[in-house]
């Protein structure tokens, strides 16, 4: 909805696609939170309204961008290294935190969730209808996959580049 905010944590393999889908399908203000500059710059090129670099002040920056409230929706494509508690704190009262990335334990005080009426939703894959909708957006040129190819013997370099935030989008190993 116009005037609402959506935070996307992680602008990598899935996050960069989500930015484009959100831009094509809704009028929400898109705030991307990223640990590395290259993916954050790429997110801005893809249409994100705001970019926030993880530097220890990211929660305050998101609160500032959302007039002190937090976002109606926060989608965490990372799911590790503290992104989950960070994302829950960025979610406004009555908002929803969507967890897509996995690897981290979710620990929250029940009273915080109850008092603020926040929701947590896990998402592994979409429906066939959603996949069809994504393919239509791609066919119209509204969603494009960003990727960097590596030879199979460069797998370690690909992992290092991913970890260092040097890749815009997906890393793909080819034989």
Question: Where in this protein do the model-derived segments appear?
Answer:
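Residue-level detector of alpha-helix initiation sites
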Residues: 12-16, 81-82, 104
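Residues in the short beta-alpha loop(s) of Rossmann-like NAD(P)-binding domains
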Residues: 35-36, 103, 126
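Rossmann-fold dehydrogenase core element
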Residues: 96-98, 108-148
């Amino acid at each position: 909805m116009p005037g609402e905010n959506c935070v996307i944590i992680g602008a990598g393999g899935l996050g960069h696609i989500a930015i484009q889908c959100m831009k094509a399908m809704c009028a929400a203000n898109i705030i991307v939170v990223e640990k590395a500059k290259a993916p954050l710059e790429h997110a801005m090129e893809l249409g994100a309204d705001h970019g926030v670099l993880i530097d220890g002040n990211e929660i305050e920056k998101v609160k500032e961008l959302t007039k002190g409230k937090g976002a109606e929706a926060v989608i965490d494509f990372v799911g590790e290294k503290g992104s989950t508690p960070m994302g829950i704190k960025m979610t406004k009262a009555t908002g929803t935190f969507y967890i897509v990335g996995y690897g981290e334990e979710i620990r929250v005080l029940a009273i915080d969730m109850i008092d603020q009426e926040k929701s947590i939703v896990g998402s592994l894959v979409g429906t066939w209808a959603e996949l069809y909708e994504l393919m239509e957006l791609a066919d119209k040129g509204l969603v494009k996959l960003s990727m960097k190819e590596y030879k199979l013997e460069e797998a370690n370099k690909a992992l290092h580049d991913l970890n260092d935030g040097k890749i815009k989008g997906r890393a793909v190993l080819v034989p």
